[in-house]
UniProtKB/Swiss-Prot annotation:
Belongs to the glycosyltransferase group 1 family. MshA subfamily. UDP-N-acetyl-alpha-D-glucosamine binds at Q19, P20, G27, R233, K238, V294, E316, E324. It comes from Pseudarthrobacter chlorophenolicus (strain ATCC 700700 / DSM 12829 / CIP 107037 / JCM 12360 / KCTC 9906 / NCIMB 13794 / A6). This is D-inositol 3-phosphate glycosyltransferase. GO terms for biological process: mycothiol biosynthetic process. Homodimer.
Amino acid sequence: MALIRRVALLSLHTSPMEQPGSGDAGGMNVYIRELASALAEAGVEVEIFTRATSASQPAVEHPDPGVCVHNVLAGPTKKIPKEELPGLLHSMVEEIEQIRRRQPHGRYDVIHSHYWVSGIAGLELSELWGVPLVHTMHTMAKVKNLLLESGEQPEPRRREVGEHRIVDGAARLIANTSSEAAELVSHYGADYDRIDIAPPGVDLATFTPAFRTKARRDHGVDPGTFHLLFAGRIQRLKGPQVLVKAAALLRQRRPDIDLRLTILGELSGNKEFNLRKLVADAEMDDVVTQLPPVTAPELAAWFRAADVVVMPSFSESFGLVALEAQACGTPVVATRVGGLSRAIFHGRTGLLVDGHHAADWADAFEALYDDPATRVDMGRAAAIRAQNSGWSRTAAITLESYHAAVDRHVGHLVPAVPVT
């Protein structure tokens, strides 16, 4: 078996150093940073490459022992829409190659790219360096386009074409769940034998069920309040509009419930999506509190302060928030879609809802409100189940994928030309 000493992780469209829940930062950012840290703990040197988005960013950051982040200069040193990144691929690849040449080691054993833009760059670098590419999609254009709401902009054709090229050219593909692996096969014709399934983990030192009473008190949640919590980017795909409608319906049905809804996150994507207006139109201003994203320790405290964490997503490759909330001992109500259907044990650690009808979601909330003993049991079961989901497990599976990629690498890769 080949020895993996050094890995280049590509996350060109968003930095793992960014705050999850803002801009394009979300579960993928957490995934990359935690995976890198766990790989480093396993003895692998990890170098992450991301595009610099501020003139004040240092060229190199060292977030954890054995992990460094290169802020690659390509295009303007500011945040730009993801749609403009393909035009910078050539300059990003050139800059990464220059960084590699300046390194004393001068070589990586594996390239691991995340998201399609990084995958296209990864194909070029794989050919240039003569090392295998391992790729994790995180989201897929064809899957997202199947779930579009009326009036929403579809993912561009060039992304679909790019993802097909990545599937054909990568030595290994890593999926978060078996359902994501099935989507790679059905939508992109991937060879199932080249797919490894590495479920995301959770930071079990941060996301713990301790001090729930203190968390509620610290966040001003009264003992009798039924507290619903949403944490994530504010975009239609994540479904906060479904949650607001369902909470409003629950309030109409059950005026006896002292209801509170906290939304942690910032607007991402379509700037016309106005959550505050939706809240006002539903006459829920006195119930809903919208706050910016918070650090992981504070997020864990918010999870502990909630009775239920809600994820009404239209698509999720995994749904890291669901796992983190359960690790804090809080049941999760989520859409039965993608990785959420596996992250949550329906009836044991939370509830899965089919579709996005507000009445169905209100039914789920009402059922849990009326049965506090079940909520407690679900929370306990959720915390116990999460104990088997540390990042070391994810890193071990990922390392196996790297080994398989290196062992099977024969130097023949699909010619990599940036998609235009």
